[in-house]
UniProtKB/Swiss-Prot annotation:
One of its GO terms (biological process) is DNA repair. NCBIfam families: dnlj, PRK07956.1. Keywords: DNA damage, DNA repair, DNA replication, Ligase, Magnesium, Manganese, Metal-binding, NAD, Zinc. SMART domains: BRCT, HhH1, LIGANc. It catalyses: NAD(+) + (deoxyribonucleotide)n-3'-hydroxyl + 5'-phospho-(deoxyribonucleotide)m = (deoxyribonucleotide)n+m + AMP + beta-nicotinamide D-nucleotide. Zn(2+) binds at C408, C411, C426, C432. This is DNA ligase. The keyword Plastid does not apply. DNA ligase that catalyzes the formation of phosphodiester linkages between 5'-phosphoryl and 3'-hydroxyl groups in double-stranded DNA using NAD as a coenzyme and as the energy source for the reaction. It is essential for DNA replication and repair of damaged DNA. The lineage of its organism: Bacteria, Pseudomonadati, Pseudomonadota, Gammaproteobacteria, Enterobacterales. Residues 592-670 form the BRCT domain. NAD(+) binds at D32, A33, E34, Y35, D36, S81, L82, E113, R136, E173, K290, K314.
Length: 670
């Protein structure tokens, strides 16, 4: 079981990182296919071990969090993502699941549409007028991009017709046609400006401009594909008729939509679109297949992060052949050593590819890869390249073996690989400049100490100029030193000093999360903070005491122990304690609390609509409850919100009491 927990935790950590890179930073590091593989592997493991499912698992969420630069918008109806299938066998399995759940053997009618490769947005119309536009964000909260969306001429500022609902929120995709993308990049090259890697990145970057005048100059367009909120009106009872209604209101809808009855017609449509893909004039990465009857959609319902009545049938990644020139090794925040192949540049799906991730030593061994080999490079999801195979018959005589380093290429510290883990790591910790940069970026991030304005470029300069070696050094910075950085004037420097001053007041949970202890995410940091209450108590804890904390197992307990016992980390924490502070937590004496939650282990599952999850946790904890992320025999109560999944099923299986959010609110008020 320990190796399963370790594998699950490792997958969650990797997926969270790559979600942030893709959805928040628009800087993905791995192919979509690799992300999908990891997500499916995690889903499979959690299905086999439902007691290990936690609220903060990537399988229980849609996407990633919004940026701070824009006002946040809470979606009244969550914007869910779609599950994916990658071949005909997987699609037929989806088709069978739908038939089985509906208890019918008759062929079903599906509405098949293009899967656009852009940015999902929500458009809210009140009395026919566009009043708000928002990105998907994490599915619950997005970014208010109304001013930018109003500049997109394809989007009507007012709906047409007499039957417009009082309030209607439509969903669709903002994207950049290929011709406009090429023209934008050509102009950028002439001016020596930023060139975008692909149309999706260009669309995302254009929508996230703080100045709408810049967005207005970008060749963006939009297709509508669904509805979220509807108030004061009616829609047809089939999806394709809804699309026609959107079109009648003046909303753009793709012409490549088709009703298909039975799996043979669906697969034929998929193959036809795959064949026509290159001539569409805009990027797609598959076909979306939806049960057309809205009554049947309601019967099928949802799982935690996606509807049961729809799936995305994705195209195979596009591939080309090239040669490996060299292999270099990069170092991440936790010391993970990632081999990267430097390739003979080759055009794959319209983009010049010169680098590809090799993931780890096991992947190199699996491929049988050598320097000088001819390899197959795939751009999964048309975004990120990876080496998927070696063309052995083209191997030259002078290839070189790839030697995985035993010392860190940045700091020279030993590299170790823990038994059972695929990832090798530098043991240098914050002594390693590469780890220092990534650790500092994490320390100042929004969910950690939230130092507003302290971006990646600033961190990199601070480390390179040796102004900062560890997080404690950040609080010794002066405006004078900061003004010596690129693009840092006196006012910006003063603002950054003020942001650092503000960050000194935090919470124990945020502080623990900011330290960057392996496997300690926000939820685990909050549990550790609630359990130990002070740093001294946490320092004094042994493995068994740590394991008594909700969601902390053997692996996480060892990571915490190792981090706190390392001499360099101890010194950094001591320095931080001199400047960073948080409110002294009040001692909660459970026996003195008159509450139905006192002394109970409580699990929250599904989407809450009245309170946010954080608010619910805070109020439950204040009334003496221990809030856990997983259901076990020790759980006393499960609070089930909308679209509750495996945790609810586990609770019912174990005979644990289940209440809904309304009942929780009533009990909180007693």
């Amino acid at each position: 079981m320990e190796s399963i927990i370790q594998q699950i935790n490792q997958l969650r950590t990797s997926l969270r990182h790559h979600e942030h890179q893709y959805h928040v930073l628009d800087a993905p590091e791995i192919p979509d296919a690799e992300y999908d593989r990891m997500m499916q592997q995690l889903r499979d493991l959690e299905a086999q071990h439902p007691e290990l499912v936690t609220n903060d698992s990537p399988t229980q969420r849609v996407g990633a969090a919004p940026l701070d630069a824009f006002e946040q918008v809470k979606h009244e109806v969550p914007m869910l993502s779609l599950d994916n299938v990658f071949d005909e066998e997987s699609y037929l399995a989806f088709d069978k699941r739908v038939h089985d759940r509906l208890k019918t053997a008759e062929p079903l009618t599906f509405c098949c549409e293009l899967k656009l490769d852009g940015l999902a947005v929500s458009l809210l119309y009140e009395n026919g007028e566009l009043v708000r536009a928002a990105t998907r964000g994490d599915g619950t909260t997005g970014e208010n991009i109304t001013a930018n969306v109003r500049t997109i001429r394809a989007i009507p500022l007012r709906l047409h017709g007499d039957n417009v609902p009082r309030r209607v929120e439509v969903r669709g995709e903002v994207f950049m046609p290929q011709a406009g993308f090429e023209q934008l990049n050509e102009e950028a090259r002439r001016k020596g400006g930023k060139v975008f890697a692909n149309p999706r990145n260009a669309a995302a970057g254009s929508l996230r401009q703080l100045d709408p005048r810049i967005t207005a100059k970008r060749p963006l367009t939009f297709f509508c594909y669904g509805v979220g909120l509807l108030d004061g009106g009616e829609l047809p009872r089939s999806h394709i008729q809804c699309l026609m209604q959107f079109k009648a209101w003046g909303l753009p809808v793709s012409e490549r939509v088709k009703l298909c009855t039975g799996s043979d017609q669906v697969i034929a449509f998929y193959r036809q679109i795959e064949q026509d893909r290159a001539g569409l004039g805009f990027d797609i990465d598959g076909v979306v297949i939806k049960v057309d009857d809205l009554v049947l959609q309601e019967q099928l319902g949802f799982v935690a992060r996606a509807p049961r009545w729809a799936t995305a049938f994705k195209f195979p990644a596009q591939e080309q052949i090239t040669q490996v020139r060299e292999v270099e090794f990069q170092v991440g925040r936790t010391g993970a050593i990632t081999p990267v192949a430097r390739l003979e540049p080759v055009q794959v799906a319209g983009v010049i590819v010169s680098n590809a991730t090799l993931h780890n030593a096991d992947e190199i061994e699996r491929l049988g890869l050598r320097i000088g080999d001819t390899v197959i490079v795939r751009r999964a999801g048309d975004v990120i390249p990876q080496v998927v195979g070696v063309v052995m018959e083209q191997r030259p005589d002078d290839t070189k073996e790839i030697t995985f380093p035993s010392q860190c290429p940045v700091c020279g510290s030993d590299i170790e690989r823990v038994e059972g883990e695929a990832v090798a790591r530098c043991t240098g910790g914050l002594f390693c400049a590469a780890q220092r940069k990534e650790a500092l970026k994490h320390f100042v991030s929004r969910r950690a100490l939230d130092v507003d304005g302290m971006g990646d470029k600033i961190i990199e300069q601070l480390v390179e100029k040796q102004y900062v070696e560890n997080p404690a050094d950040l609080f010794q910075l002066t405006a004078g030193k900061l003004t010596g950085l690129d693009r840092m004037g006196p006012k910006s420097a003063q603002n950054l000093i003020a942001a650092l001053e503000k960050a000194k007041q935090t919470t124990f949970a945020r502080f623990l999360y900011a330290l960057g202890i392996r496997e300690v995410g926000e939820a685990t940091a909050a549990n550790l903070a609630a359990h130990f209450r002070t740093l001294d108590n946490l320092r004094a804890a042994d493995i068994e005491t740590l394991k008594s904390v909700p969601d902390v197992g053997e692996v996480v307990a060892k990571h915490v122990m190792n981090f706190l016992s390392e001499e360099h980390n101890q010194k950094v924490i001591e320095e931080l304690e001199k400047v960073v502070s948080w409110p002294e937590p009040q001692q909660i004496v459970v026996e003195e609390i008159d509450s139905p939650f006192a002394g109970k282990t409580v699990v929250l599952t599904g989407s809450l609509t009245i309170l946010s999850r954080d608010e619910a946790k805070d109020r439950l904890t204040a009334l003496g409850a221990k809030v856990s992320g997983s259901v076990s025999k020790k759980t006393h109560l499960v609070i089930a919100g909308e679209a509750a999944g495996s945790k609810l099923a586990k609770a019912q299986e174990l005979g644990i009491k289940v209440i809904d959010e309304a009942e929780m609110i009533r009990l909180l008020g007693e």
